[in-house]
Amino acid sequence: MDIEEVIEEALQKIVPKEEEERFVKTLMSEIEEKARETIEELNLNAKPYFVGSLAKNTYLAGDHDLDLFIAFPLDTSLEKLREKGLEAGKVLGKKLGRYELAYAEHPYVRAEYKGVKVDIVPCYDVKSWKDVRTAVDRSILHTKWVIENLKGKNNEVRLFKRFLKGIKAYGSEIYVRGFSGYLAEILVIEFGSFLSVLEKADFMLKKKIIDTGKWMKKESEITMKTIKREAEEDKPLIVIDPVDPRRNVAANLSWERFGLFYFSSMQFLEKPSLEFFFPGEKRGNYREELKRKGTHLVTLLFTPPKLVDDLLLPQVEKTAKGLAKALEIEGFKVFGIDYGRNFIFLEVDRVEKPRIEIKRGPLYFTSHGRRFYEKNEKVWIEGKDLMAEKKVGGFIVEVLEEIFKKGQFSAGKNVKEVIKSSDILIDFVPKPLANEAYLFLSREKFNVKRSTS
C-alpha cells in the first residue's frame, strides 16, 4: 500500500462513527446535567467544564475516558476548594454509579458511568495563565485553545495520536515520558498535518524551540527563562505552552521516547505500513534471552502502597536506580533496570561474588595499626601494611538482604519499607511478568531497528 492508502485504512479504524459520536455527546450531556444538579444541591459557587480529548473531539474510536473539572472562583481558598471539590465529586460519583478516591496534587474522584471512566477534579476557574494556582488549572485553557485553533484538523490529530501509541511513545506520565495528547495537538496545529509532523522530526530536534503561542514577542523575559531552564536540563524539545509562557509542554518527554518517534517517522515515510499504527504484540522467552546474553535477572516482588501511578512509579524508579547503584558498589555490574507497580527487574553480570574481601590497613607499627589488628580476625603483613580478610555475603540475595537491613540505598519515601520485605527471585519470574521480562532483557521497549522482512 502507498502512504495515502495506509492513512485511509488507519482512519477507518480510529475515527468514531456517527453512532459512537451520538453516544459520547449524550453521555457528556447527561453527566453535565448531573454535575450542575450536584453543584446546585450543595449550593456551590462553581462551574463544570469538560476537558481533554472528548471535549476537543480528538479522541480515538473506543477511547472514552472523560475528565470533568469542577471550577471554583479564584477567591476560593485552596483548603475550601479541596474540601468542597471532593464533596461535589463524591455526590456526583454516587449519582453516576460507583466511584473511588484517587490522589494527585489534591484528592479527586474516579467514577464510572455507562462503562466510561470519569475523573471529577476540582480546580480554579482561570481565564489566563496569570490566574493558575494548581497544576490542573491550565487544562481548561488548553481545551479552549485547541478548540479555537484546530480548524478541522481533528483527524490529523487522531492519526498522530494513534501513531504515537503504536510506536509506544504516547503518554506524558512520569513513568512513560512520551508525547502527551496536548503536545500531539500542538504539533499538528503548528505543522499542519500528521505527515508534516513526521517530516519535521529532524527539523524540530535541531530547531529545539517551538513557540506556537508567539510568547517570545508578548512575554520575552518569562519565555527566555523557561527556555534557559529547560535547555539546562537537556530536554529533547522545548514547546512553550500556547497558554502559559512559563511551561514547556514537552517537559516530560524523554530522549528515548523522542528517539522512537524520530526513527519511526523516518521509517514510516520510507516504507509506510499499518503496523506503525497497530503493531503486533512482541513476545518472546526471557529464559532464552538470559541464555543468549549470559546475564542474570534479579526480580523483586512487593506489595505496593495505595498510590496512583503518577505518585507511585517515580518512587519505584528511584528505588530501582538506588538498588542498582548499591549493587554496583558491592561489585556487581548492573546492565539495566525496569519496574512496574509491584516489581523491579535488575539485569546483572553474575549472582555470586567472592565471599571475602581483602582490606588494606594502616602501618603495623602505628596506633591505628594496633586497632586494626585488634578489630580483625585474620590479619597479615604485606611490607609495612597490615592486611585483613573480611567475610561478606557472596550470593546476590544475601547482598541485597544486607543492603535492605542497613537501609543503604536510595528509595522513594513511600516504598522503601515495602521494598525491604520484597521476595527476591533469580532468573525466574511469575507467569504474568514473563513477557515483561522478555521485553526488558531483549530491549524491545526502545528498539528502533525494525525488521525489513
UniProtKB/Swiss-Prot annotation:
UniProt binding sites for CTP: S53, K56, H142, K161, Y170
Keyword terms: ATP-binding, Magnesium, Metal-binding, Nucleotide-binding, Nucleotidyltransferase, RNA repair, RNA-binding, Transferase, tRNA processing
Cofactor: Mg(2+)
Enzyme Commission number, as recorded: 2.7.7.72
Residues annotated as binding Mg(2+): D65, D67, D119
Annotated InterPro entries: CAA_C (IPR048833), CCA-adding_arc (IPR008229), CCA_tRNA_nucleotrans_2 (IPR042090), NT_2-5OAS_ClassI-CCAase (IPR006116), NT_sf (IPR043519), NuclTrfase_I-like_C (IPR011068), Polymerase_NTP_transf_dom (IPR002934), tRNA_NucTransf2 (IPR015329)
CDD domains named in the record: NT_2-5OAS_ClassI-CCAase
Binding-site positions, ATP: S53, K56, H142, K161, Y170
Substrates-to-products reaction catalysed: a tRNA precursor + 2 CTP + ATP = a tRNA with a 3' CCA end + 3 diphosphate; a tRNA with a 3' CCA end + 2 CTP + ATP = a tRNA with a 3' CCACCA end + 3 diphosphate
GO molecular function: ATP binding; CCA tRNA nucleotidyltransferase activity; magnesium ion binding; tRNA binding
One GO process term, biological-process aspect: RNA repair
The keyword Disulfide bond is assigned to this record: no
Top-tier EC class: transferase
Family: Belongs to the tRNA nucleotidyltransferase/poly(A) polymerase family. Archaeal CCA-adding enzyme subfamily.
Physiological role: Catalyzes the addition and repair of the essential 3'-terminal CCA sequence in tRNAs without using a nucleic acid template. Adds these three nucleotides in the order of C, C, and A to the tRNA nucleotide-73, using CTP and ATP as substrates and producing inorganic pyrophosphate. tRNA 3'-terminal CCA addition is required both for tRNA processing and repair. Also involved in tRNA surveillance by mediating tandem CCA addition to generate a CCACCA at the 3' terminus of unstable tRNAs. While stable tRNAs receive only 3'-terminal CCA, unstable tRNAs are marked with CCACCA and rapidly degraded.
Self-association state and partner proteins as the record states: Homodimer.
Miscellaneous information on this protein: A single active site specifically recognizes both ATP and CTP and is responsible for their addition.
Listed name of the protein: CCA-adding enzyme
Source organism of this protein record: Pyrococcus furiosus (strain ATCC 43587 / DSM 3638 / JCM 8422 / Vc1)
